[in-house]
């Protein structure tokens, strides 16, 4: 195997695929990156046993002299290439089990792993497919993934639910950890029906991997055919918890309410839970906060529109901030029933997104 390749390009791909490598794996070969040089491209494959990633480089960024493959620990090759400053480098397998990395006035030889021990990972699929642009996929992930549970006893809450609604020609994306819920809807014109739960870890990794210029295709196609990637189980019908009638609605500049709540939380840390209370009384709106270690703070909201009855509702500041930041609109509307029922956040300028946050009993 001999290939001459742009240093920046290979380093970028190595860093992308190496993110999922787990140092806790019991399979030694999974500590490595499988590099395969073919007739017109070079591929990089990694896996943690559950999630697998394959990336390719082709075109003018490389010149292939001899095809072949090599398995090498990711840390070694990444650190060596990171130190090289030349525009191009050459990778060459020598003596069967060594890889030589060459550049101007630089030569390094590294030990390799046995590539024959690497598990066979098939990325070929024959199932249903759905195509997202990277822009849409990144928006879906940023607006929903924060609500995915991490170590929930109900394992289905540890993933992102994606299902079709053929009646409304929509794709419904839902995440919840049982304390908050995020629901995103996008237009969907295919006749394929599916209802899958994708692990949160995989969703977040996809979000980090894709770039704005990529066309992300066949995401569900790949996952559906790799059964271990799917969380088995039936996702609950969350439409039943999203109410359509409310007693009070508060419309406000989104950035303004975010800043107010952030000021209420500025002295807290990850070990503290800041309880933020929204008080609506006689066309006056106050935001107060309380932490056991610090005490109380209060701020009055100036510009807003409120309709309905007075309310006093307390909630976790992190949960409400995550929900508000998911919206890219100028204004949002917070809809409330009472201090015990979930509040719903929507936006007139984005009918595709709803956020739900459960209140906290502050007494």
From Swiss-Prot:
Major site of localization recorded for this protein: cytoplasm
One GO cellular component, as annotated: DNA polymerase III complex
GO molecular function: 3'-5' exonuclease activity; DNA binding; DNA-directed DNA polymerase activity
GO biological process, one term: DNA strand elongation involved in DNA replication
SUPFAM superfamilies noted in UniProt: DNA clamp
InterPro entries: DNA_clamp_sf (IPR046938), DNA_polIII_beta (IPR001001), DNA_polIII_beta_C (IPR022635), DNA_polIII_beta_N (IPR022634)
Keyword Transcription regulation: no
Domain of life: Bacteria
Localization per Swiss-Prot or TrEMBL: Cytoplasm
Database matches in CDD domains: beta_clamp (cd00140)
Alphabetical keyword list: Cytoplasm, DNA replication, DNA-binding, DNA-directed DNA polymerase, Nucleotidyltransferase, Transferase
Protein's job: Confers DNA tethering and processivity to DNA polymerases and other proteins. Acts as a clamp, forming a ring around DNA (a reaction catalyzed by the clamp-loading complex) which diffuses in an ATP-independent manner freely and bidirectionally along dsDNA. Initially characterized for its ability to contact the catalytic subunit of DNA polymerase III (Pol III), a complex, multichain enzyme responsible for most of the replicative synthesis in bacteria; Pol III exhibits 3'-5' exonuclease proofreading activity.
PANTHER family for this protein: BETA SLIDING CLAMP (PTHR30478:SF0), DNA POLYMERASE III SUBUNIT BETA (PTHR30478)
Family: Belongs to the beta sliding clamp family.
Subunit relationships: Forms a ring-shaped head-to-tail homodimer around DNA which binds and tethers DNA polymerases and other proteins to the DNA. The DNA replisome complex has a single clamp-loading complex (3 tau and 1 each of delta, delta', psi and chi subunits) which binds 3 Pol III cores (1 core on the leading strand and 2 on the lagging strand) each with a beta sliding clamp dimer. Additional proteins in the replisome are other copies of gamma, psi and chi, Ssb, DNA helicase and RNA primase.
Protein name in UniProt: Beta sliding clamp
Species annotation: Spiroplasma citri
Lineage, broadest ranks: Bacteria, Bacillati, Mycoplasmatota, Mollicutes, Entomoplasmatales
